[in-house]
Design a protein with these regions (language model features):
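Cysteine-nucleophile active-site neighborhood
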Residues: 104-179, 184
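Short, flexible helix/strand-to-coil boundary loops that buttress conserved ligand/catalytic motifs
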Residues: 12, 148, 189
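Active-site environment of divalent metal-dependent phosphoester hydrolases
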Residues: 72, 184-187
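Short, intrinsically disordered, charge-balanced linker/junction segments flanking boundaries
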Residues: 190-195
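Short histidine-centered beta-strand/loop micro-motifs
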Residues: 76, 177, 189
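RNA-binding accessory domains that recognize and position tRNA/RNA substrates
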Residues: 1-95, 99-100, 112
Length: 195
């Protein structure tokens, strides 16, 4: 067909964050009208977070997981370590978290742009981190950085899918991970932050 797919790939990669879509045969314009009328929410975390707290009992350390779009793998790993887990909604307050007297707090992964998460979440992180160790995964990590004055920026090319190599610098060991991320902490702002 004489289409240079390598050149197309390079153009898409170099252009930054591309628009995504699929080309399919459509018998009429009604499908396009529906697409134009679709409004995507910026409040993705509110859509996927648990509406009510729930326990994931264990006999070990007490851990609160703040659900920004929690994946079962996180709970599974905490259970393997016998942690006594309480999962709270994304909009839990610092007082609600601290009242549980946790040994640690996990800020879970989740969807979307961290800048759209309500500022009350950043305030909760600031208050809780003064009294309890925090661990952020994905979106939780980005929110932790924002709460402490670092900047979070879009990746030039998002990372989605499996088999992304990650090199552990100290041991020179390479592991492969599934990734789904569109943002990263701007490391040039970390030195000026509270991190």
């Amino acid at each position: 067909t004489n289409i240079d797919t390598r050149a197309i790939t390079h153009k898409l990669r170099d252009a930054g964050k591309p628009l995504k879509g699929s080309i399919v045969p459509v018998p009429d314009d009604h499908a396009f009208d529906q697409l134009h009328a679709t409004v995507l929410t910026n409040q993705q975390v509110a859509q996927v977070s648990t509406p009510k707290p729930y326990p994931n009992p264990g006999v070990g350390m007490s851990v609160v997981v703040v659900d920004f779009g929690l994946k079962n793998g996180i709970l599974r790993e905490l259970s393997r370590r016998k942690c006594n887990v309480t999962v709270l909604p994304y909009n839990a307050t610092a007082d609600e978290i601290l009242r549980l007297d946790p040994d640690g707090v996990v800020l879970s992964s989740g969807p979307g742009d961290p800048h759209y998460v309500k500022s009350a979440v950043l305030e909760m992180i600031r208050k809780v981190q003064e009294q309890v160790p925090l661990f952020g995964i994905g979106l939780g990590h980005e929110l932790f950085a924002l709460a402490n004055g670092a900047q979070v920026i879009p990746l030039g090319v998002e990372h989605h899918g499996m088999n992304h190599p990650i090199k552990e610098i100290i041991t020179d060991h390479i592991v492969y991970a599934n990734q789904s991320e569109g943002y990263t902490v701007d490391w040039s702002t970390v030195d000026r932050s509270k991190l």
